[in-house]
Amino acid sequence: MKTEIKFDFEMVMGVVEYTRRLRFGGQKFSRAIMIEKAIEKTSKNLTYVGLDDTLGHDFTTKVNGEIWRLEAKGADHLFQTDRTFNTVKITLKNFQGNVNNNFPEKKFDEMILIDQTQRHIGIVSFEDALKNFDPKKNLKKSGLKIVVDKRDVEYIAKNVSLAPKNQVKELYHEIVDELYKWEDESDEW
């Protein structure tokens, strides 16, 4: 791991738990943004850029004077507990029908992996995340799905406790207010 990841794991896992009801269909996108914003708000060194879809990563930080790009991915039971060495399938990119057979362009340097049920957080390099990439297996019309070999993951937190609910609730409402702030104070349309 080249990046030192600094954010409040307990607060972020609290937001993961607090937003659990948003894990179906179109709500997943909103939940991901909430979790990513929680990482940003509790981070000492990560800048959130995830709302710009053209970038292909969620955070930036500086490592030895250069910009380092990080992608965040989370799922229930991400680090499966059965005998497999792989994570569950992770959607890396949604092509929405536009699939090419080339190796994915490098849009991030490291990936933050969040297991939302076991409450583990790990990090893996782009190269290790895609080392088993096979266009025939991984590219579908719905997007690019990968599995990461868990032996390549550096765990930065395991069995994370939840922050006190009142603190998590306060952070959650701060994020909602920021994301959905009503800009116009006038009563006129």
What are these regions (language model features)?
Residues M1-W189:
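Nucleic-acid endonuclease domains
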